[in-house]
Amino acid sequence: MSPFLHDAHALNRRQFVIRTLAVGAALALQPAFPQNVPGGRDRRSASPRKVIILGAGVAGLAAALKLHEIGHEVMLLEARMRPGGRVHTIREPFSDGLYAEAGAGRIPITHALTLSYIERFKLAVDPFYPESGGEVFLWNGKRLVVPHGGDPDLAQLQTNLTPRERKVGFGGLSKLYFDALREQVHALPEAGWPYPDFKRYKDVNYGEFLRRQGASPDAVAYLSQGFEEDSLLDFAHDAVSHAVPKLWKIRGGNDLLPRAMAEPLAQRIRYGAEVRRIEQTVAGVRVAYTAGGAQQVETADRLICTIPFTVLRDIDVSPMWSAGKAAVVRNIYLGPVARVFVQTRTRFWEQQGLNGFATVDQPMELWSPTYNQPGARGILMSYTYERLAREYSHLSPQEQIDRMVALLEQVHPGVRAQFEGATTWSWLNEPYSKGAFTVTRVGEFEDLRHVATPEGRVHFAGEHTSPWPGWIQGALHSGLRAATEVNEAG
């Protein structure tokens, strides 16, 4: 049986935040894939072109594979020394072959395009969340063990919830505050995103939306996980991918996908190539970049740029972008994400009937990525968002580790005694992304119409240009879309 057809368990508690914007909304919000299915046998191009692709992340690799398959000459320029971009699995400095995700961690069961690539490259998947074991809930200094799939007993916690919130519990807050929005989403036509009917929400952030309905500070903190300032439209849009019965991860590490995609393109990728200038001429495009300390220039008929706009805005271009494109390049926001990974001598929490995952009263998630990896040692890791992620990113690695170990000791007493080592990662501090994933803020949704439009011979791909920002699916979809544009260009 295909691993994608295994039983679909109930939503993990972390997903309840947006579970009410479910399958009906997903059908409305997700546009169709391009007709060129990955691995399909498209008709070879009658007029092959040379195409430079900036970035060997998932979007760039998807575009390159498709164009190469139909006869175009492709060259990828990648600043890093590895493929994958923000799909990045950390294996060092961990022992015994352990690994954890610094980048994209979850693959929704509804993301058929991503799963088709996983099947194409014969990779296996495992459930992202453990399917057994209790979880820890740490709120206002009170630690509580919650049975798998259950909700915390509010009588044992110090909370500042309203009477009606206490009545439904933490597990009912999403339903309490999203029922009306769910009905509105279901009623919308399939006419593209963002919908005109949603214009009344264009100046509303997520936290404000909750507070307008009487949500308490604790309810807002629990539901938003640090995304209070996120546009309500952005939150609703992203909710579709979360509100699924199952999330997967790739066995062996999510970076196995971009590594597999890069293998047939190995001689067409130039690593360590930092782009300095993009120039369009009447005849084509010129890209100036540095590699090995030397200035290099490449020319081509067309160019696909997958560089995040947070980085692209510092690259010289000639001629300048159109006004709409320049504005979105200048203003687009990539949310900060910081992660701390702690290796322990044993997975002692499992002997206590726990699976290692936890919910805390801070804008972060706590994961146990090694729950299904072989060996005795384990990793506990944090996934920190927004304000707190920015705060962590400004600390030294040792300060981040000390702070996280102190928190983990509250969640899983005994971490200090079992501690063997740790490492950190900040996408805000990573020079080739300067952020983790696109977050659309209040007032910015109307600018999105410019994010994916070509500029002359330059085409754009990447999660930020897709209907699924922040997801592998978005990167793949955008790469195929850009490849289609190039192939169909006159």
Regions found by a protein language model. Give the residues of each.
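Glycine-rich FAD pyrophosphate-binding loop
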Residues: H68-I90
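N-terminal export leaders
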Residues: N12-L29
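Conserved flavin/dinucleotide-binding core of flavoenzymes
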Residues: R19, V37-P38, H148, G284-R286, ...
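Dinucleotide-binding Rossmann-like beta1-alpha1 core, especially the glycine-rich loop
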Residues: S95-F170
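N-terminal secretory signal peptides
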Residues: M1-N12
